[in-house]
Amino acid sequence: MRIFSLALGFLPLVAGHTLMTTLYVDGENQGDGVCIRMNRNAEKATFPISPLANDAMACGYDGEIAAARTCAVSQSSTLTFEFRAYPDGSQPGSIDGSHKGPCAVYMKPVANATSDNNAAGDGWFKIYELDYDSSTSQWCTEKLIANNGFLSVQIPEGLRGGDYLVRTELLALHAAQDSPPDPQFYVGCAQVFLEGSESGDVPEGVVIDASTYSLDVPGLTYNIYTEPLELPYPSFGPSVYQPNASASTENAKVSGTQATQKDGLQPEGCILVRDDWCGYEVSSYSDEAGCWAECWTQADECWGTYLPTGNKNCQIWQDKCTEIDTQCSAGNWNGPPNKGKVLTPELEGVGGSMKVFSGGVSSADSEGSGSGIDEAETEMNTSQGAAFTSTPAAETAVAADATATATATTEDAEATTAAEAAATSGAGRPGRGHGHGRGPEVYADITVYDDNDHLSNIRPVISCCKVNLGPNDSFLRAARFAPIFSGSHGLRIDYSDTHYWLIAWPVNVVSFDQCLPQPQGSAPETSRTAIHLFAFSRAALSPYTCYLHLHIIEFTISAAFDQNDAEES
């Protein structure tokens, strides 16, 4: 028997990270992951940027990797961004309600949005910001949640036509007052081509890179729990760009050379879109050899390359291949059937209001564009973070304080990716198994799984922490551990070749009549905030529904079991 003891505590749920997944142009859905730069690691895609001194502050992790597509937009188009706690949309939600804080949107002109390594650096100008709206007593993130995860902005008129990166920035302040402070930035970028004159406005920009943010900026250590709040909120960064109304109108009417999109267009012949991937019609065939040739090669590529937004459309392509197989097996070697039929499903529209949130500042304000911003709130922000700098060639960015590295949260720094837990979407491809242990090691990975389908659809949602399973020194190395836990049954720990489940419920918080069937035995008499954890092997676990909302900072698990016997609990 091996004693498994983790020194771990607990708090109510404050987990629930987020990712910007989808762009809508004037209400038209461009498709999940289309024209979006995002973290390509599905297990960490929703994580905040850490530490603050990080070039990922520009467009997020993997934000220097360009998307294949650039979406066309018009002067004064409304851009709507969708944020999801589950990037593939498998469960609802945008960001946890505890994650209160401001929002901002920036733009940056680039020579080619589909080129890599053009995010961090100068050229960024702000077109929208909203922190705390005193008229509604809401933070921007609260308005985002109330609007089903949709944030809209209007492009200012008169900008020079061409390629741009559009950067969304959410700042969660729920742990900003901690020691050390832990402000959590969630940033992402869309690639757009702005139609218009090549002689339009080019706003002065600022640098966004590893030097931009530090704990010296007051807005990053703001205490949202102070009553009453200390208002106004100390906004940071550059003022929102406000074009001269008359100049913008004239620039918009310039009849000179109009910018023409050359890069990032949807490839000709693409009949199925899945984020950066396109499926192309197979070549016509008239014999048995040609009948089997091409379809499954594309299917394998679709299943093997999808972004965190999911692989839903891969099943559509697989169905096409199966239909071809059926025809081939029947001796019908003339095809393909339904040649050239577009398979991309019709996309849903914006699932919330497209009105720009009131209470903030927008570049569109000065143009009377009807953006929905309160008239009283149109003054430019004058409280700027010192780490932001304008970008004329003679100027350089102010270096961030070296202590910014101390703000790294261990949930990312100590996170370990479980190599065999790659099937994060839970959808369709035959033979895609669930993750399991790496074999006997001194250090074993902990992977947190979300299971809402009674063990039938197990999804790894976060890999975190290494546990020393040595006989004399068992401990959890990570101090913070925040799984996405809405509607989950428990934690699964993968160790060796067995799966051990830890089932938790809050005593006197979630009533047992919400857990069907009830766990055997009666709950111990303990305090209201206590969490009781029970270790089960996979075989010993009887599925039951008990919806828990937990944020596990530290907790204590003590269980004795034979690591080679998955039937013991």
UniProtKB/Swiss-Prot annotation:
Its main location: secreted. Its EC number is 1.14.99.56. Residues 399-424 have a biased composition (Low complexity). Induction: Expression is significantly induced by pectin. Expression is also moderately induced by cellulose. Expression is induced on lignocellulose, such as steam-exploded sugarcane bagasse (SCB). Remarkably, expression is also slightly induced by glucose. The promoter contains the consensus sequence for xlnR binding sites (5'-GGCTAA/G-3'). Residues 399-439 are annotated as: Disordered. Its cofactor is Cu(2+). One of its GO terms (cellular component) is extracellular region. InterPro entries: AA9, AA9_LPMO. CDD domains: LPMO_AA9 (cd21175). Disulfide bonds join C59-C189. GO terms for molecular function: metal ion binding; monooxygenase activity. It catalyses: [(1->4)-beta-D-glucosyl]n+m + reduced acceptor + O2 = 4-dehydro-beta-D-glucosyl-[(1->4)-beta-D-glucosyl]n-1 + [(1->4)-beta-D-glucosyl]m + acceptor + H2O. This is AA9 family lytic polysaccharide monooxygenase A. The lineage of its organism: Eukaryota, Fungi, Dikarya, Ascomycota, Pezizomycotina.
